[in-house]
Design a protein with these regions (language model features):
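Short beta->alpha linker loops
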Residues: 33-34, 111-115, 137, 257, ...
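Glycine-rich active-site/cofactor-binding loop and its immediate structural neighborhood
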Residues: 73-115
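A gly/proline- and charged-residue-enriched helix-loop-helix capping module
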Residues: 102-123, 127-142
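Short, conserved beta-strand segments within well-ordered enzyme catalytic domains
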Residues: 50, 65-67, 76-80, 106-110, ...
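An N-cap/entry alpha-helix motif that binds or orients negatively charged groups
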Residues: 1-71, 169, 176-234, 372-373, ...
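Alpha/beta catalytic cores of nucleotide-metabolism and tRNA/nucleoside-modifying enzymes
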Residues: 1-47, 291-390
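Alpha/beta enzyme core
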Residues: 84, 98, 102, 122-123, ...
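Short catalytic-loop micro-motif centered on adjacent basic/acidic residues
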Residues: 29, 107-109, 129-133, 251-253, ...
Length: 390
């Protein structure tokens, strides 16, 4: 396939996408919490590692495929769930699903998508889908969504566990971020219609609060800012409830950054975890996901799969994450940049760039199978500039 000479790297894709997004959308997708240090460190963590290639190996046939969620994925990465994709392009999540289908890559869908989970599932064909999930304080809303995902054929629900409260994103506050009136949170449109029939003018949403000792639940149309946070969740109650409710779908947790929580995830019989800090959008100063990965891999000890997201901007980053013990990677912002740049074709470009870079990295490293990637192919750059073997 011919190269897009305007865009040969993910960095160039970001620049091109920035030119096509309005300020509110650009800031919403790209901003991190507070000063944004975790967003930057998610990326810079990969620069701490150097590659140790092996030579004089036959790499004429390189197989980059892996099995994930019971299907063969063309590369060891998927498209991470990201909310409200019609902000970037009118086709939104449908463009993402079609691009994933064309490239043989698994897609995650946000609960707060601007396309229904059923329409995304149809557009995905035989490519597996996962549904990112929040457990709302009004559990009925979550239960409805889980049942719809089950009926539509989703392979797993992925519970976001790092949002007991919402991180502070200053540009969202300054821009007074809101979804444009022509768009809606599609998976909760029925609930929206209920409020539309009882209110004249704008439909209000309110977050939960306490009246004395009584907790008043979120009200109004379901939005991330009013309903996404849930400070009442606990290991003892939420995980058993979700496993029972979601069966036979798998239950994964996204937002684990410590070995202690990884061990609790194993103890509570979840099917897998995603090492994630919400793209640096929740708690600024959190461990970069790549820095957290080795501790979590050791704690899990191969009892369940360990995936990772955050900061990946090149195929070699994927190689490094796998070498440190990740089983699979998820790509977020670069896919949104592809969507903003050129819809489905832009996402396909993003996925092709990362896939080509990863396969080239495999070959130049002397590796022909993903399962052969290990720590022996990395060394770490120390603060004094010296390299140390892992």
């Amino acid at each position: 396939m011919a190269h897009d000479l305007n865009c040969l790297t993910i960095a160039e894709l970001e620049v091109l996408a920035t030119e096509r997004m309005d300020k509110q959308t650009r800031d919403y997708y790209n901003e991190g919490a507070d000063g944004g240090s975790t967003v930057r460190e998610n990326m810079s963590a990969y620069k701490k590692y150097r590659l140790r290639p092996r030579v004089l190996r036959n790499v004429s046939k390189v197989d980059s495929s892996v099995e994930v969620l019971g299907a063969r994925n063309s590369v060891p990465f998927g498209v991470a769930p990201a909310a409200m994709q019609k902000l970037a392009h009118p086709d939104g999540e449908l463009a993402t699903a079609r691009a994933c289908k064309s490239k043989g890559i698994v897609m995650g869908l946000s609960s707060f998508s601007t396309t229904t989970l059923e329409d995304v599932r149809t557009a995905s064909g035989n490519i597996p889908n996962i549904l990112q999930l929040y457990l709302f304080e009004n559990r009925q809303h979550s239960s409805k969504l889980i049942q719809r995902a089950k009926q539509a054929g989703y392979k797993a629900v992925v519970l976001t566990v790092d949002t007991p409260l919402l991180g502070r994103r200053n540009l969202e506050i300054r821009n007074q971020f809101h979804l444009p009136s022509h768009l809606k949170i599609a998976n909760f449109a029925d609930e929206d219609d209920i409020y539309a029939s009882t209110w004249a003018g704008p439909r209000p949403s309110s977050a939960a609060f306490y009246e004395g000792d009584h907790r008043v639940l979120p009200a109004g149309p379901i939005t991330f800012h009013s309903h996404g946070a849930n400070p009442t969740l606990s290991w003892e109650e939420a995980i058993p409830w979700l496993k029972q409710e979601a069966s036979p779908m798998q239950v994964w947790l996204k937002g684990i950054v410590t070995g202690e929580d990884a061990q609790l995830a194993v103890a509570h019989n979840v099917d897998g975890i995603i090492v994630s800090n919400h793209g640096g959008r929740q708690l600024d100063g959190t461990l970069a996901t790549l820095d957290a990965l080795p501790e979590i891999v050791a704690a899990v000890d191969r009892r369940i799969p360990v995936h990772i997201d955050g900061g990946i901007r090149h195929g070699a980053d994927i190689f490094k994450a796998l070498a440190l013990g990740a089983d699979f990677c998820w790509i977020g912002r670069p896919v949104l940049w592809g969507l903003a740049y050129d819809g489905q074709a832009g996402i396909e470009l993003c996925l092709r760039l990362l896939s080509d870079e990863f396969r080239l990295c495999m070959g130049l490293m002397g590796v022909t199978k993903v399962s052969d990637i290990s720590r022996e192919y990395l060394c770490r750059m120390k603060r004094d500039g010296l390299l140390s073997r892992l």
